[in-house]
C-alpha cells in the first residue's frame, strides 16, 4: 500500500519538517579513498529543528581519488642531489613522496626518515 502525498504533508506538519526537492544535476561525495558520483539524482532538502538534512537518491558510481601532483623544480632536484649524492630519478621520487619538502626529501634519501 503506497502512502498518499497528503499523508506525507500531514506527517511533515506534525514533525515540523519543511521539505524542498532540489533540481540537482550531479552529486559528488568525496570519501578518504574514493569518490562517489551520482548523476541525475533526486535530492530532497529537509529542515528539522533548524538542521538541514539532504536525502540523495540515485545510482552511485565509484571513481578513484587522484593524488594532487606536486610540481618539482629543477633547482630543488639539483640542490637535493648535491646534498645527498643521489641520482636525479631517485631525488625526484623522494621529492614527490615528501610533497616537495626539500628537508624531508633529504631525510628520506639519507635514511633518517621513514
Swiss-Prot record:
SUPFAM superfamilies: UBA-like. It comes from the Archaea. It holds the Pfam family NAC. Coiled coil: none annotated. Keywords: Protein transport, RNA-binding, Transport. The keyword Translocase does not apply. Residues 5-69 form the NAC-A/B domain. GO terms for biological process: protein transport. InterPro entries: NAC-like_UBA, NAC_A/B_dom_sf, NAC_arc, Nas_poly-pep-assoc_cplx_dom, UBA-like_sf. GO terms for molecular function: RNA binding. Homodimer. Interacts with the ribosome. Binds ribosomal RNA. NCBIfam families: archaeal-type nascent polypeptide-associated complex protein (TIGR00264). Contacts the emerging nascent chain on the ribosome. Belongs to the NAC-alpha family. This is Nascent polypeptide-associated complex protein. It comes from Sulfurisphaera tokodaii (strain DSM 16993 / JCM 10545 / NBRC 100140 / 7).
